Amino acid sequence: MSRRIDSHEFYEVDKSGKEISFLFDGSVVWAREGDTISSALVASGRKIVSRSFKYHRPRGIYDADGYGPESLVTVDDEPNLLADRVLARNGMDVRSQNNWPSLDFDLAEINDVFVPFLPNGFYYKMFHKPKWLWPIAEKQIRKVAGLGSIDTAGRHNSRRYEKRYRFPDICIVGGGPSGLAAAKAALGEGKQVLLLDDHPELGGHSLHSLSQIQQSPFSELEGLSEHEGIRKLAAELQDNPNLEIMSGAMVFGVYEDNLVAAQWGNDLMKIRADKVILATGASDRHLVFDNNDRPGIMTARGVERLIMVHGIAPAEEAVVVTTHDGGYHTALLLHGAGVKLKAVVDSRASGTEGVFEKQLEDLNIPIYREMTAHRAHGRKKLQRVDVGPVKGGESFQSFDCDLLVTAVGLMPRLNLLSMGRGR
């Protein structure tokens, strides 16, 4: 069961946000200022937040970052907003999508039983004979197609959708450590800088990192932990009159002649810059195993974000599956939040004996080498994980847990770079 934490062994928990509440499918959810919808739902103990598009399998919070498949919700009659990115507001009305009659009891989940009979494009071949059958089937297929419902009643027709323009010297996409470092350097040369980031808070992955800053080009940050240093850097830059920051701006296009297109709230931003810097960072890779989509399976960065940014322990018992040293950092954060670590499962024969691994060994946390996850058990929530040899074969051991963390490396976000024909 997830819960709020008042203290953590390795950092100071921010408890300054005042308590607010909102509705989720008609039920009251308590949150703190600074929470996203997703983090508030996790803190309330909710496991299922959505249903998969076709088979209506239950979905939980996966990466808490807006890049998972689970976080589309309707907020105040506006459909398809990312619960991982939308900040909780007092009194807001949030509804889940793609389920009937309810999120926890979705009759369309029966589709999951008929997976072998519903391959991709099945509707092109089925229901066409006899001829009278297709018009009936077509109506039913159209009912289940698409996600979210448009506000056809016009209850919020006062919303305005504008087109706005900016002409900075430098446009930086990404407000993580690289983007902020680039902004600081450009501002030092007297440039007009526009910084766009798709999250409510600047800082990227450094917001949930305990690692110590070393060999920094900025001497004032040397020796600080990353989460302290990045907040200090962001606070310093925000007061610069030559910098405009657009938090929560989703950049969706980079075109010829340095034209950048973004959605910022309800506005379409068209930005023409002398230079464009892409500092879009990376996201967690996915681990393939049986039932890897069940509620209770999360990425490492998603877990770290819940703990360090929102002060939430996402489970009672956890297993961490990793392929690199970063998995030990996540495991240490879980331990510091009071989560019982059943095992750290490392696919490598040996690591680099980093500081986080050494701390876990001193805490007598079981570490299994050359192993990985084989199968997850549970339907509406994770109940057990089977682990075994990386090369396959029989599972070696099973662990009862309500959280499986996958830390299997990062993949750079190259979409905008590819679109802009970058190399």
Per-segment meaning from a language model:
Residues 2-423:
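Residues forming the flavin
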